[in-house]
Amino acid sequence: ILVGPIRHNLEAFGVAILAAVLLKWFCIEAYQIPTSSMQPTLMGSVEANVHDRILVIKLIQTFRDPKRWDITVFKYPLQKNQNYVKRIVGMPGDRLYISGGNVYQVEGDGENRKFTVLRKPDDLQEETWKNVYPQRRNTRAETKSLPQVFGASPSRAVDEIEGGFTLETNGKTAFLYFRDEADGGMVDRVWDGYPVDVARPMREQEAGNGFLVNQNRPQEIVPDVRLGCVVSIEKALKEFSLAIEVVRPEHEKYTYAFAVRGGKGVLEVRGADKSIVLGKSDEFDVALTPGTPTQLSFAHVDEQLIAWQDGTELQRFESAQWSCREGCAIPFSNPFTAPSDRKVSPQFRCTGGGKVTLTEVRIDRDQHYTRETAPEIIDVPEGHYYMMGDNTLQSIDSRGWTAITIGVDKDLNIVPLDSPDCVRQIRGNKRAMDLSGAPDRDETPIALPDQNTIIMIDEFGEILRLKGQPGSN
């Protein structure tokens, strides 16, 4: 029997190991993000070799129920040996509709359906903005913004200076508008929002693939945009506005704007006839004083308009009546270039006065959700949650998760589930790929026709070699 300090040390060592195991099993555990599905919130970039590490507190759900927009680590029900990290988008009992980059709660049926956008809390919204300008220009290592990233009207009225632009109104209207022809305009690009050293290899890989887009993952224009700048004026303007123009086929053209006139601001929506205001907020105070730089920002996000001055929110205005729910998808014939009948154009406009200087120009876009293969109306069963990755273009999540059950006999030959020879039902994740492509690490089942074999990973992570040929299922 051990006595003295050796025994005490062994006891202490044993208790420490037991405590560590219990802590890891029940309380807290560290994970490395393996994939890109939650980027850029949580990095798991193979292209840039960047993998965030997170600390998961397992006891949180003991004290409170999961909430919408929570980031959650969970065991994938169809492959329980894998931990997934996603964001909770749908709650038990929800009826969801995904369109135009937003997620909606649906009430009613048919023509009586009512859509209510699910808005992110302000602090989360701030974190999920993805910078487009100057990030895209810097990613391409370009030094100038005119005329490729921005266009100007009239062109002679706008000059590019170090750190910004000048607009000469000469008593008329001049405006600067975002076009970014190199990356297709205000489109949901997978590399938006990343640091340049991460975005560049991601974009280069896409270019190497010819900017091909999975047919189940269409690119879309992004109507939810925030733009801002520091405005310096030499003398009083008749009007200065930050505007977002949205054009979609078979839908009315909308221009959302934060306009400043005579020391007053207003949030407004105009249609194809810009002389007609479809809706507007109450006026609010906002000053543009000659010789005093002022930071202004404006966003159209989650069917509301928001204005800020020097970081302080001035006004919000509900714009659900003039929604961009439909018409955002880009045809597959040319998925990298937004056609002329589908575009989102952030604009900086000024009328009257003299020279206007814009610095710290910035354009961000919102997190853009796409439906992909999910049904039009998504019914979330009671006791279940609808999970999506922040990087919707590279996320395998609730939109595409599908279970498959295969029957086998005692020799692992595939047989119909209702066959008397069926002695076992194997359940797992259905993530089959094109047989001509390279296998994916999570691909299952994998068919090997020349060997009369199907490789399948069951729900417990066991790799099984089944005998049979691929069929319609």
Predicted regions located by residue number:
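Extended hydrophobic leader/signal-anchor segments used for secretion and membrane insertion
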Residues: 1-473
